[in-house]
Design a protein with these regions (language model features):
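Helix-adjacent hinge/juxtasegments
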Residues: 82-115
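Residues that define the transmembrane beta-barrel architecture of outer-membrane proteins
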Residues: 25-27, 48-54, 93-97, 141-147, ...
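Bacterial Sec-dependent N-terminal signal peptides
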Residues: 1-27, 32, 190, 194
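Predominantly the C-terminal beta-signal and adjacent terminal strand-loop region
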Residues: 71-73, 79-84, 135-198
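Short glycine/proline- and aromatic-enriched beta-strand/turn motifs that initiate or cap beta-hairpins
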Residues: 21-63, 70, 169, 195
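Outer-membrane beta-barrel translocator domains and adjoining extracellular loop/strand segments
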Residues: 41-47, 82-88, 125-133, 174-179
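Residues on the lipid-exposed face of transmembrane beta-strands in outer-membrane beta-barrel proteins
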Residues: 31-35, 54-64, 74-76, 99-105, ...
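Outer-membrane beta-barrel channels and translocator barrels
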Residues: 22-24, 65, 108, 156-158, ...
Length: 198
């Protein structure tokens, strides 16, 4: 079900950007990837530490005016956290397909401010202690909502760029627990816009 939904979202992204490109010639499709530093914030006494991960996916950059743009993305993101009990480390690995839709304000020098909502669809969830890995997907809610904000830069002549953002989780990711846990993390990555103009 989640795979079909992800494919449908990808089809909408590609079709929508292609249609807009045909009508306005102000749309770019791109690829992106980068590093995650994520953590889990919770209401109980567990002290989580940030854990590195990665993200990779597609984006569409839609010019609304000279200064404003809309950027929907379809990204696989490895998130989670880690904690230590009695000198034993446990990693929580949460894999999401995230769909942020960002409004961007574009400066003439290539810099961009961006912010917008994000919805994430859980793909996999595992808890790993030493060499033992346990599937915890049933303990994590299938959909996550967040707000994203950050800054980016695209080289006007080439279409290559860098992107930094912070994602603040808004919804409880615990399926069964009596306490609330939310995702939050920072991302740093690179991207490339095909047929980039301005």
């Amino acid at each position: 079900m989640k795979l079909r939904l992800s494919v449908a979202l990808l089809a909408i992204l590609v079709a929508g950007t292609a249609s807009a490109q045909h009508s306005a010639q102000k749309v770019n499709i791109g690829i992106k990837g980068g590093l995650n530093i994520y953590n889990i914030n919770n209401d109980n006494n567990t002290e989580y530490d940030a854990k590195p991960g990665f993200n990779v996916g597609l984006l569409g950059h839609i010019h609304l005016s000279r200064q404003l743009a809309l950027q929907p993305e379809l990204v696989y993101s490895l998130q989670g956290a880690k904690y230590t009990v009695s000198n034993v480390d446990t990693k929580i690995n949460l894999g999401y397909i995230n769909v942020p839709v960002l409004v961007q304000y574009m400066f003439d020098n290539g810099f961009r401010l961006q912010a917008g909502p994000q919805v994430g669809f859980l793909v996999n969830a595992k808890s790993k202690t030493g060499s033992v890995s346990v599937d915890i997907k049933d303990d994590v809610k299938p959909v996550d909502f967040a707000l994203s904000a950050g800054i980016g830069y695209v080289h006007p002549a080439s279409g290559f760029g860098i992107d930094a953002r912070y994602n603040l989780g808004l919804s409880d990711i615990n399926e069964n627990a009596s306490f609330k846990s939310t995702n939050r993390g920072a991302q740093l990555g690179v991207f490339y816009l095909f047929n980039h103009k301005r």
